[in-house]
């Protein structure tokens, strides 16, 4: 089995890690960073830019830059660039492809298998969409694991004794809280809760809204209509939020943000930590609801928690830490890196699957209840939330009308009593039921949830033995043919990226060779053979012309044609120089002879 990597595919940043010689290492990207911004941009010529470079150009290219795509996973959302629409899976695949390529360059080998993390509260549709993104990027996703569980693995792998830990995971776009019991290599999730629409982006948005409203009051201009201005505000808000974790106030300075008849307008305001806390107080409180829910589901009180792990960059916000400190009456544990621990945990799970790490058992749970719609639009649960996975459960149902020959099984996920208020995972129909009075046929509905948290459902008529099943695989609205097309497209773009990189590198080499040749001519033209000088000048001109094309082979051929006469030219110059030196010093046939004065000391 080849190397299996662990990937934290985040809303704001992503991270990749691998087990190397018994230790997990976080793999730096091509730019040298340990995390990669989850940003994808499209250049004017259609080229794809991912990561730090994409984030840097976002201000000047906001309409062709995609951020926080994870928030749309498992939905019908589409990103339109030029005349082409992209699914969240395709955009996520571009981020995964960047991580994969950088890891391959770092490790010097192909990466084909991965463990990818998702928020614990991700639905089946969102989990399946994440698997699809992995496939499009050319990765076999061996396991999907929950982010808080991965963080617990990173924390607890080398810990002895039993502990009850709570993982508070506030990322860029999602919030999860999980309670685990760990000890003797067993990591058992007792309860999980969360909110898939709450994260650091929402804290940024509060600052943006505050800036926009103040500017509108002062100047009567609504900056929301200016995409470039909004991108500048987003970057400034994120920067201010980060700075306020370390200082009590920060300056937000955005010159030339807009203009009116009197000239350019600027933003230059001071944001204090107290004001930021006021703007975001309800967001902090919103994280405490799921925290209380998880404790209640696990049958625990705050004092029963031994350690609180903070995961995700947003947990650096002082108000968040204070809320946790106040609720649990203890300091949260700060011994793990909140940006990297999820990828590290995924790499540990990858090493477990590869057989490199022994005696580790991971028992995760399903975050939401699963069931079907029954008579009257009621949601009937078959598997309760926080059930350990993998698991299976069956229940007998019957027909609602006389002589009913088919039943539609509507599969749902959620906690609300009515079917319409929950997430629909899919529908399928069991046909061929013999006509009978209502209540007579017996239909067994069976749910199976695999280790990835992905659902398989079957319905069987116990009278005839007829069975129909569905694996909830197309909840992300991608057919197998679409996924295959996207995989091929991603491979084609990877090849185009490779060619583009090769072209740039060859162009740089050619440019360097021309510089070297021209410098040599400038320094030694008077001393050189005129024929050689003419050949070098001709070769330089031809190489310059070749550089105007995108033909790598032509550039290389012309570089070769320049290298030969340039080598002859420099060799002849060195030979001339050597001959001159020899003439000046003369030729000595008796080896090295030295003239020396000497003095005889007479001790007599």
From Swiss-Prot:
S-S bonds: none
Phosphothreonine PTM positions: 174
PROSITE patterns, alphabetized: HSP70_1 (PS00297), HSP70_2 (PS00329), HSP70_3 (PS01036)
One GO MF term attached to the UniProt entry: ATP-dependent protein folding chaperone
Low complexity biased stretches: 579-592
Family label: Belongs to the heat shock protein 70 family.
Physiological role: Acts as a chaperone.
This protein's name: Chaperone protein DnaK
Species this protein is from: Carboxydothermus hydrogenoformans (strain ATCC BAA-161 / DSM 6008 / Z-2901)
């Amino acid at each position: 089995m080849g190397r299996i990597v662990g990937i934290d595919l985040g809303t704001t940043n992503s991270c990749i890690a691998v087990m190397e010689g018994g230790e997990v290492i976080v793999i730096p990207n091509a730019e040298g960073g340990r995390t990669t911004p989850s940003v994808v941009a499209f250049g004017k010529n259609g080229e794809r830019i991912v990561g730090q470079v994409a984030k840097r150009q976002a201000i000047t290219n906001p309409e062709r830059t995609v951020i926080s795509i994870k928030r749309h996973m498992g939905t019908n959302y589409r990103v339109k660039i030029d005349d082409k629409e992209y699914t969240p899976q395709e955009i996520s695949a571009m981020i995964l492809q960047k991580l994969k390529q950088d890891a391959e360059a770092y490790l010097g080998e192909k990466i084909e298998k991965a463990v990818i993390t998702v928020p614990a509260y991700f639905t089946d549709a969102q989990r399946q969409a994440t698997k699809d993104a992995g496939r499009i990027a050319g990765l076999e996703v061996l396991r999907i694991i929950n982010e808080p569980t991965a963080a617990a693995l990173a924390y607890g792998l080398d810990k002895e004794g039993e502990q009850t830990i709570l993982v508070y995971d506030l990322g860029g776009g999602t919030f999860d809280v999980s309670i685990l019991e760990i000890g003797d290599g067993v990591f058992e999730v007792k309860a999980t809760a969360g909110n898939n629409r709450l994260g650091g982006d929402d804290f940024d948005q509060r600052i943006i809204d505050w800036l926009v409203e103040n500017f509108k009051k002062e100047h009567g201009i609504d900056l929301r209509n200016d995409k470039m201005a909004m991108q500048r505000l987003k970057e400034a808000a994120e920067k201010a939020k980060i700075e306020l974790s370390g200082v009590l106030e920060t300056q937000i300075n955005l010159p030339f943000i807009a203009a009116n008849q009197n000239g350019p307008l600027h933003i230059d305001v001071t944001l204090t930590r107290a004001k930021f806390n006021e703007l975001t107080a309800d967001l902090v409180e919103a994280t405490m609801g799921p925290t209380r829910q998880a404790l209640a589901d696990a049958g625990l009180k705050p004092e029963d928690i031994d350690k609180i792990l903070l995961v995700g960059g947003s947990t650096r916000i002082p108000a968040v830490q204070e809320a946790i400190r106040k609720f649990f009456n203890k300091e949260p544990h700060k011994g793990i890196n909140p940006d990297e621990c999820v990828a590290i945990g995924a790499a540990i799970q990858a090493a477990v699957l590869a057989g490199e790490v022994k005696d580790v058992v991971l028992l995760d749970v399903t975050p939401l209840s699963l069931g079907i719609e029954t008579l009257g639009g009621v949601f009937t649960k078959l598997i309760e939330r926080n059930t350990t996975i993998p698991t299976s459960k069956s229940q007998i149902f019957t027909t609602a009308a006389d002589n009913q020959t088919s039943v539609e099984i509507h599969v749902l996920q959620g906690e609300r009593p009515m079917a319409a208020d929950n997430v629909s995972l899919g529908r399928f129909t069991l046909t061929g039921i013999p006509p009978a009075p209502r209540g007579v046929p017996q239909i067994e509905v069976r749910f199976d949830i695999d280790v990835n948290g992905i659902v398989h459902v079957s319905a069987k008529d116990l009278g005839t033995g007829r069975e129909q099943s569905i694996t909830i695989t197309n909840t992300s609205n991608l057919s197998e043919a679409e996924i295959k097309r996207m995989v091929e497209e991603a491979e084609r773009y990877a090849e185009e990226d490779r060619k583009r990189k090769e072209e740039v590198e060859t162009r740089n080499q050619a440019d360097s060779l021309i510089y070297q040749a021209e410098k040599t001519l400038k320094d030694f033209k008077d001393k050189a053979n005129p024929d050689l000088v003419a050949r070098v000048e001709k070769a330089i001109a031809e190489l310059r012309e070749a550089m105007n094309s995108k033909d790598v082979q032509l550039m290389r051929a012309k570089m070769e044609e320049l290298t030969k006469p340039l080598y002859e030219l420099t060799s002849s110059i060195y030979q001339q120089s050597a001959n001159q030196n020899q003439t000046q010093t003369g030729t000595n046939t008796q080896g090295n002879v030295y003239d020396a004065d000497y003095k005889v000391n007479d001790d007599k």
